[in-house]
């Protein structure tokens, strides 16, 4: 989205975009610039190391990393940078994303990855959480997040009858 991106949204393969675009849609709605890139832990390990080692220098304050199957991307990025990493397990056809969840959530002590839910809801929440992290130092973003939440609440309150 922008060269001034403070959030990077990376994924293990192009097929993960269907899930990870949920994070970028939230960031777009909140007017938060981000960078998007495919970085495969298994197919492009050198690229992964370069991305992670340069994350802070490139201005990223939060990294959202989504992967499916043997989902090593979030953990490997976290191992190579001190920039906070939010991991999104992408639903897989074989084990419905449970394999991805376990790969991301079971990190060893000392290398944290903030793990979200499996699939699109997890990606959307990763976008929200990344924005909330940045909002601690950005009053305008904080205000936009308040409006987002208020809008969510009003959508429920304004439509209480599930039949309509």
Curated annotation (Swiss-Prot):
Keyword Isomerase: yes
Any single GO BP term: 'de novo' IMP biosynthetic process
Disulfide bonds: none
Database matches in InterPro entries: PurE_ClassI, PurE_dom, PurE_prokaryotes
Binding site for substrate: 13, 16, 43
Alphabetized GO MF terms: 5-(carboxyamino)imidazole ribonucleotide mutase activity
Role: Catalyzes the conversion of N5-carboxyaminoimidazole ribonucleotide (N5-CAIR) to 4-carboxy-5-aminoimidazole ribonucleotide (CAIR).
Protein name as annotated: N5-carboxyaminoimidazole ribonucleotide mutase
């Amino acid at each position: 989205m922008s060269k001034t991106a403070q959030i990077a949204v990376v994924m293990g393969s192009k097929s993960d975009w269907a899930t990870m675009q949920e994070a970028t849609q939230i960031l777009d709605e909140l007017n938060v610039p981000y960078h998007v890139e495919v970085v495969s832990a298994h197919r492009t390990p050198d690229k992964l190391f370069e991305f992670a080692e340069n994350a802070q220098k490139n201005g990223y304050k939060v990294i959202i990393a989504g992967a499916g199957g043997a989902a090593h991307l979030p953990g490997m990025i976290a191992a190579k940078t001190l920039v906070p990493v939010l991991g999104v397990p992408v639903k897989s056809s074989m084990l419905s994303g449970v394999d991805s969840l376990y790969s991301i959530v079971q990190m060893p002590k000392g290398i944290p990855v903030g793990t979200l839910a499996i699939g699109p809801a997890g990606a959307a929440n990763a976008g929200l959480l990344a924005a909330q992290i940045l909002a601690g130092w950005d009053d305008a973003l904080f205000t936009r997040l308040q409006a987002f939440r208020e809008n969510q609440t009003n959508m429920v309150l304004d439509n209480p009858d599930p039949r309509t």
